[in-house]
Amino acid sequence: MTGNADSGKIATEKDPRKLVFTKLEVSPVFRESPVKELPLFPPISREHSEAKDKTDEEGITSRKHKGCRCKQSKCLKLYCDCFASGVVCTDCDCVDCHNNSEKCDAREAAMVNVLGRNPNAFSEKALGSLTDNQCKAAPDTKPGLLSRGCKCKRTRCLKKYCECFQANLLCSDNCKCINCKNVSEAFQPPAFSAHNSPQVYRRRRDRELTEWNSCPAPLFSIPDNSIQNALGSPMSCSPKLPYRKKRSLMGYTSTLLPDLGDLCSLLVAASESATTTAEDQNRIFTKPDDKEAIELSSESESRNVEEEIQSRGRLIELIDVQYNGEEDSQCKTKTSVNETDIYMEQERAVLETFRDCLQKFIKSRLES
C-alpha cells in the first residue's frame, strides 16, 4: 500500500497537467454552473442606464458635449450653453448652479421669463441633428440650427472653434462661414454659408457696379438740349479744366523731347485767346444789326396789334409766334456765323503755336 501511494505521488509530480485536466472534466462545479446567470455589467451601469431612460421619458436629455463654466448667472440665462439648449447641467464646472432637477421652480421661472421675450429662444438652439436616414425619411424637416450662426473662415467648420460643430449641429443660412464642410449630403440649404459671406457679397456688388457702369446710358435719359449745347459749344470751355501731368514710367523726362503737358497747355491757351478776341469783334460788329432788328420787330408788332385788336387771346398768340419765330431765325443765323468765325480763329491760333513749337524743337535738336 505504501508503494502504491508513493507511485501516485511521483506520478502527480511528473505529469501535473494531465491530472488537472482530468479533475476539470470530472469536477461537478463547471457542469452545474450555468454561464447565463453571470452578470455581464456591474450594477452601477444598470442604475445609470435606468436613470438615463427615466430622464429621457421626462424630457430631459443627457449632456454629451463640454460642460459650462458659469459663475454669476446661476446657469439661468442664455449665456449658459446648457440652459440655452434646454439641457440640465451635468458634470459642469459652474458655480451656484440652479439648472438642475433639485431647483426646478427657479429653472421653470427663468424659462418662462425668456420665452416671454423671445418665444423661439429654445427651439432655435435645440441640441442634436438629424442623421442621414432621418433626412432621407423626412427631407422637409430641418434639424435644430443655431440662431446667430458661426463665422468660421479657415477651419471649414470642422473644429471645436465652430459653435455649430461643438454643439453637434449643421451650419444654417444664418452662418457666415467660408468653405464650410459641416453639411450633410441629404440636406443642403438653398442659400448656404459661403454664398452669404461678406466677401462674396462684396465681389458680387463690385461686379454689378462695373457692369452697370460699362453699359451705355440710354438716349432718352439724356435731354436733347444738353446734347445740342455740348455739340454746338466752342472749345472755349476746355481751357478752364486743369491739365494734370503724368510722370513717365522711367521716373524722369528727357530734356530733348518736348513735354506733352506743356505743349497741350500752350495750344489750349492759344485757342482761348483766339476765342476771346473773336467774341469781342463779334460784339462790336453786331450792335447796329441788333438795333435794326429790334426796330423792325417793334413795327411789325404795332401793325399786328392795330389789325387784330378785337380778339385779345388770338392777338397774344400771334404776337408770341411771330416774335419767337423771327428771334429764333435771327439768332440761328448769327450764332452759326459767329461759331464758324470762332472755330476758324481757334484753328489758326492752334496751328501757329504748334508750328512755333516744332521750329524751336528742331533748332534745339540741331544745336545739340
From Swiss-Prot:
Does the record's keyword annotation contain Zinc? Answer: yes
Q: Which UniProt keywords apply?
A: Developmental protein, Metal-binding, Nucleus, Zinc
Enumerate the subcellular locations listed in this protein's record, separating them with semicolons: Nucleus
Xref: InterPro entries? CRC, Lin-54_fam, Tesmin/TSO1-like_CXC
Q: Where mainly found?
A: nucleus
In terms of domain of life, where is this protein from? Eukaryota
Locate the CRC domain: which residues? 64-185
Domain remarks in the Swiss-Prot or TrEMBL record = The cysteine-rich domain CRC binds zinc in vitro.
Record function comment: Plays a role in development of both male and female reproductive tissues.
Q: What is this protein called?
A: Protein tesmin/TSO1-like CXC 8
Organism of origin: Arabidopsis thaliana
